[in-house]
């Protein structure tokens, strides 16, 4: 014995390792395409609910949410189209230069969506609970629903960003 202690792994079953490439939610997969479609759907519902309120344009936060949802819809639909085309022709987006663009675009869109959702939710609470003008006149339910769908859209695009960034960081 030389006095050094070397530990060896005991023989046993192979250790299962989890790899990001095995996930079906990274760009260019059916899971990612479904996530993009869900992002688009949540954003379009938020947009539709907000513009259905007659006086949304009188509040800056609500106008910002509408603009953020338009950006979210355009971004999600564009990326979904690219991912759908890549799947159709059998091309992988894992090593594509578009991956950096997807990560930055998802991050920027997520930040703008979150800001719009927070601002709109804050104004909806202010109008509904603090000013006491009556929510029937002020469409508080619609404002809250639009903010809720915007938060859902933000959650979905944040998921896309995290997986895309993780894939970008590990390649």
From Swiss-Prot:
<protein>
    <recommendedName>
        <fullName>CASP-like protein 5A2</fullName>
    </recommendedName>
</protein>
<feature type="transmembrane region" description="Helical">
    <location>
        <begin position="107"/>
        <end position="127"/>
    </location>
</feature>
<dbReference type="InterPro" id="IPR045009">
    <property type="entry name" value="CASPL-5"/>
</dbReference>
<feature type="topological domain" description="Cytoplasmic">
    <location>
        <begin position="1"/>
        <end position="39"/>
    </location>
</feature>
<feature type="topological domain" description="Cytoplasmic">
    <location>
        <begin position="170"/>
        <end position="171"/>
    </location>
</feature>
<feature type="transmembrane region" description="Helical">
    <location>
        <begin position="149"/>
        <end position="169"/>
    </location>
</feature>
<comment type="similarity">
    <text>Belongs to the Casparian strip membrane proteins (CASP) family.</text>
</comment>
<dbReference type="InterPro" id="IPR006702">
    <property type="entry name" value="CASP_dom"/>
</dbReference>
<feature type="topological domain" description="Cytoplasmic">
    <location>
        <begin position="83"/>
        <end position="106"/>
    </location>
</feature>
<keyword id="KW-1003">Cell membrane</keyword>
<feature type="transmembrane region" description="Helical">
    <location>
        <begin position="40"/>
        <end position="60"/>
    </location>
</feature>
<dbReference type="Pfam" id="PF04535">
    <property type="entry name" value="CASP_dom"/>
</dbReference>
<keyword id="KW-0472">Membrane</keyword>
<feature type="transmembrane region" description="Helical">
    <location>
        <begin position="62"/>
        <end position="82"/>
    </location>
</feature>
<keyword id="KW-0812">Transmembrane</keyword>
<feature type="topological domain" description="Extracellular">
    <location>
        <begin position="128"/>
        <end position="148"/>
    </location>
</feature>
<comment type="subunit">
    <text>Homodimer and heterodimers.</text>
</comment>
<dbReference type="GO" id="GO:0005886">
    <property type="term" value="C:plasma membrane"/>
</dbReference>
<keyword id="KW-1133">Transmembrane helix</keyword>
<feature type="topological domain" description="Extracellular">
    <location>
        <position position="61"/>
    </location>
</feature>
